[in-house]
From Swiss-Prot:
GO molecular function: rRNA binding; structural constituent of ribosome; tRNA binding
Record organism: Sphingopyxis alaskensis (strain DSM 13593 / LMG 18877 / RB2256) (Sphingomonas alaskensis)
Top-level division of the source organism's lineage: Bacteria
Family, as annotated: Belongs to the universal ribosomal protein uS13 family.
Region of interest (Disordered), ranges: 95-122
Assembly, per entry: Part of the 30S ribosomal subunit. Forms a loose heterodimer with protein S19. Forms two bridges to the 50S subunit in the 70S ribosome.
Name of the protein this chain belongs to: Small ribosomal subunit protein uS13
Gene Ontology terms describing biological process: translation
Function according to Swiss-Prot or TrEMBL: Located at the top of the head of the 30S subunit, it contacts several helices of the 16S rRNA. In the 70S ribosome it contacts the 23S rRNA (bridge B1a) and protein L5 of the 50S subunit (bridge B1b), connecting the 2 subunits; these bridges are implicated in subunit movement. Contacts the tRNAs in the A and P-sites.
Keyword Metal-binding found: no
InterPro entries in the cross-refs: Rbsml_uS13_C, Ribosomal_uS13, Ribosomal_uS13-like_H2TH, Ribosomal_uS13_bac-type, Ribosomal_uS13_CS
PANTHER family: 30S RIBOSOMAL PROTEIN S13/40S RIBOSOMAL PROTEIN S18 (PTHR10871), SMALL RIBOSOMAL SUBUNIT PROTEIN US13M (PTHR10871:SF1)
Record GO cellular component, one term: cytosol
C-alpha cells in the first residue's frame, strides 16, 4: 500500500482514482501528475514501483498544497474574514450561506436542522 501525503492509497484502484483520495487533489490534478511523470492512466497502484511512488510523492510535495496545509490555509482564510468583520465574515460567524443564496426558505444544510418555534401553528 502506497502512502502519499499521509494518506494510504487503495492498492486495487487505478492511479488516477487513488490520487483523488488525497485532500486537495481532484481528477484533473491527478491526470496532470500522471501525465507529467509518464504513468499510464490505466495502471493500478499495486503495479507501481517504489521509484514511481517516490516520484509522485516528490511532485505533490513540490507543486501542490494538500491535506493538513490546505485545510489550515482554508481555516485561516475564513478566520481572517471573520476577524475583519466584513459581510462574508459575518455570514460565516452566523452560520448562514455566504454567497448570496436565499435564506427565507431553504439553506437547511448551512443553517442546520429546523428548530421548532413554540406556539407557531398554521
Amino acid at each position: 500500500m502506497a502512502r502519499i501525503a499521509g494518506v494510504n492509497l487503495p492498492t486495487n484502484k487505478r492511479v488516477i482514482i487513488a490520487l483523488t483520495y488525497i485532500h486537495g487533489i481532484g481528477r484533473k490534478t491527478a491526470v496532470d501528475i500522471a501525465d507529467k511523470l509518464g504513468i499510464d492512466h490505466g495502471r493500478r497502484v499495486q503495479d507501481l514501483s517504489d521509484a514511481e511512488v517516490l516520484q509522485i510523492r516528490e511532485t505533490i510535495d513540490a507543486d501542490h498544497t494538500v491535506e493538513g496545509d490546505l485545510r489550515r490555509n482554508t481555516a485561516m482564510n475564513i478566520k481572517r474574514l471573520m476577524d475583519l468583520a466584513c459581510y462574508r465574515g459575518l455570514r460565516h460567524r452566523k452560520g448562514l450561506p455566504v454567497r448570496g443564496q436565499r435564506t427565507h426558505t431553504n439553506a437547511r444544510t448551512r443553517k442546520g436542522k429546523a428548530k421548532p418555534i413554540a406556539g407557531k401553528k398554521k
